[in-house]
């Protein structure tokens, strides 16, 4: 994007790019988040993100590479979006706004992609199991993971619809919400699974003893 100013149009589309340029000219670069009624926006965004996550997950059936490709494509879109605002000198404002909901949203999409990898790896690398049994185990494990992302998308959708639009909020408040969201992501996706597995391993050891 830095070397080709037409690249954002290729990735984000002409209409979105033109609308954003108009908002920047008006001094409201994040104006897109206030264009829709909060309730409708909450429902639409939440359902869309859940569908995206399930698409990334189910794509693992077509081998892990498809999940990786979809994650890569989404990464290009996010990178293009941020670089576009960097070119106009408002990257800081962009990050403070988008990461309010993006911290939860992007983390959940990545986790859904990992669930897709679990399906693909079960199909490609069955190990000592038959390919079908390995696939079923991977699908079951992956489904538990992706279902666990639904509450995260609901929270992210709420923040995007009701809070992100308020760019007049103090920057420290917005940064605080981002940091709390990040802490929750670490707790929900890293600490809780680790704690659960730790207790299961201890229980198994006691059973063997």
What are these regions (language model features)?
Residues 1-26, 72-73:
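Interfacial/capping segments of alpha-helical transmembrane domains
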Residues 21, 25-35, 39-44, 95-104:
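Short aromatic-rich membrane-water interface segments that cap or initiate transmembrane helices
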Residues 34-66:
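Individual transmembrane alpha-helix segments
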Residues 60, 67-87:
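Small-polar-interrupted transmembrane alpha-helices in polytopic inner-membrane proteins
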Residues 82-168, 178-180:
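Hydrophobic alpha-helical transmembrane segments and adjacent short intramembrane/lumenal linkers
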Residues 171-185:
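Small-residue-rich transmembrane alpha-helices that serve as helix-helix interface/gating elements
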Residues 184-192:
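Alpha-helical transmembrane segments
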Residues 199-209:
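Short, highly charged, low-complexity non-transmembrane loops/tails of multi-pass membrane proteins
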């Amino acid at each position: 994007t830095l070397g080709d100013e037409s690249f954002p149009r290729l990735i984000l589309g002409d209409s979105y790019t033109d609308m954003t340029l108009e908002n920047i000219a008006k001094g409201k670069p994040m104006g897109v988040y206030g264009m829709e009624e909060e309730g409708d926006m909450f429902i639409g965004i939440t359902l869309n993100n859940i569908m995206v996550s399930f698409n990334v997950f189910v794509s693992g059936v077509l081998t892990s590479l498809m999940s990786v490709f979809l994650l890569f494509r989404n990464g290009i879109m996010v990178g293009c979006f941020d670089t576009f605002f960097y070119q106009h000198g408002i990257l800081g404002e962009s990050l403070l706004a988008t990461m309010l909901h993006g911290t939860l949203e992007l983390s959940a999409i990545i986790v859904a992609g990992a669930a897709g990898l679990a399906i693909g790896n079960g199909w490609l690398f069955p190990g000592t199991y038959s390919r079908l049994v390995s696939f079923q185990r991977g699908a079951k494990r992956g489904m538990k993971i992706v279902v666990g992302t639904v509450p995260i998308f609901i929270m992210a959708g709420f923040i995007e619809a009701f809070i992100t639009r308020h760019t007049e909020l103090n920057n420290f408040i917005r940064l605080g919400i981002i940091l709390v969201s990040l802490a929750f992501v670490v707790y929900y996706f890293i600490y809780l699974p680790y704690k659960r597995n730790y207790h299961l391993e201890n229980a198994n050891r006691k059973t063997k003893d």
